[in-house]
């Protein structure tokens, strides 16, 4: 009887061990660990549509890079807007045997724990979308960043807004020679929010648009928060608001929703500009509810991250021609307005059709 119990205990122990590995996200059940790339992806939040679309693209591109010799397992977790929780999720993925980490930081100034844990296990880290401070990224040669130049997005937003305003004098509804504007900012202290805000406004003024600031409001990149902020601003300023600049499309869409609900006729709406090129924003541009966005090329970024992950796993050198300082990959933003909106909507439709056809 004792032998039976011991045998049963061993079997149960083996089963529990297998379950722990499977649930932790990065484990390989095939037993062929030398041919399996385990990629751990950790985002700052599970509620950001752009980040969700980017990680979907990353999974899709990694899937295309599988072969008879190489299997790829992707595990995606969220830090739920808590840096400590994100650190713990990273530790779980490292313990589970991930070979490459892709990290979208909660706090871009606090990557220390993640870098320390990854370095101790010699696991490369590709940070994305939220750029760490340069001093942090340069402290180890297996740290990389994939994203865009926030300054460029601010400049482009200012350019398309200035072009529209200068060719549509009716934007200046009170005909005082100045454009009264509000600005929806991502979050306090976030480098992208700071750069997009600064360069969008500077570029408008550089292009002969006289501005009068009514209000700057933080809405944490969130559509619902932006709608609430805009409702208060509409109550305060009414039709005085002639321009809404938003650090991203989600907040711009919050502004759109506020104006839909308040019941103003379209000529009393301000012109609204966002950044990211989300599908909902593209539809709003087509409908005339927004006047433009800056397309943040998630497809290009996902392709680069997938390529980097496989190359690093294979122990090969990265393509230095595409990297700045050997560590940074920046994809180019693109302007979207009424003149080219169909091109981008068609691209979104083709992408969706392609995903629906995947086995």
Each language-model region and where it sits:
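C-terminal motif of bacterial Sec signal peptides marking the signal peptidase cleavage site
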Residues: 22-25
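Bacterial signal peptide processing site
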Residues: 27-29
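Hydrophobic alpha-helical segments within soluble ligand-binding/sensing domains
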Residues: 32, 86, 145-176, 226, ...
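Hinge/cleft segment of the Venus flytrap/periplasmic-binding protein
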Residues: 35, 177-188, 192, 203, ...
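Extracytoplasmic "Venus flytrap"
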Residues: 40-61, 65, 75-88, 98, ...
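Short, solvent-exposed amphipathic alpha-helices that sit
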Residues: 50-65, 153-157, 191-210, 225, ...
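Hydrophobic alpha-helical
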Residues: 58, 103-120, 125, 200, ...
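Flexible loop/hinge segments that line or gate small-molecule binding clefts
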Residues: 114-152, 177, 278-286
């Amino acid at each position: 009887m004792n032998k039976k119990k011991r045998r049963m205990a061993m079997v149960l122990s083996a089963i529990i061990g297998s379950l722990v590995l499977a649930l932790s996200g990065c484990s390989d059940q095939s037993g062929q660990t030398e041919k399996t790339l385990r990629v751990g992806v950790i985002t700052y939040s599970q509620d950001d549509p752009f980040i969700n679309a980017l990680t979907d693209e990353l999974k899709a591109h990694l899937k295309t890079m599988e072969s008879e010799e190489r299997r790829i397992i992707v595990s995606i977790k969220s830090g739920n807007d808590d840096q400590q929780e994100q650190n713990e999720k990273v530790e779980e993925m490292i313990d589970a045997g991930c070979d490459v980490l892709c990290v979208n930081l909660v706090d871009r100034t606090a990557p220390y724990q993640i870098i320390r844990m990854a370095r101790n296990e010699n696991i490369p880290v590709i940070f994305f979308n939220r750029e760490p401070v340069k001093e942090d990224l340069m402290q180890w040669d297996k740290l990389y960043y994939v994203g865009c130049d926030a300054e460029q997005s601010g400049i482009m937003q200012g350019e398309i807004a200035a072009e529209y305003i200068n060719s549509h004098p009716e934007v200046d509804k009170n005909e005082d020679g100045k454009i009264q504007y509000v600005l929806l900012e991502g979050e306090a202290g976030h480098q992208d929010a700071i750069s997009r805000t600064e360069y969008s406004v500077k570029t408008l003024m550089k292009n002969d648009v006289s501005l009068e600031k009514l209000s700057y409001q933080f809405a944490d990149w969130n559509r619902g928060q932006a709608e609430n902020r805009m409702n208060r601003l509409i109550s305060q300023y009414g039709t005085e608001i002639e321009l809404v600049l938003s650090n991203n499309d989600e907040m711009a869409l919050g502004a759109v929703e506020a104006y839909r609900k308040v019941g103003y006729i379209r000529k009393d709406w301000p012109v609204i500009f966002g950044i990211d090129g989300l599908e909902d924003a593209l539809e709003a541009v087509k409908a005339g509810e927004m006047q433009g966005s800056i397309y943040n090329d998630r497809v290009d970024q996902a392709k680069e991250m997938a390529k980097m992950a496989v190359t690093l796993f294979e122990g090969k050198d990265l393509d230095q021609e595409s990297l700045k300082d050997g560590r940074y990959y920046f994809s180019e933003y693109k302007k979207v307005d009424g003149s080219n909106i169909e091109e981008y909507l068609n691209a979104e439709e083709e992408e969706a059709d392609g995903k629906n056809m995947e086995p």
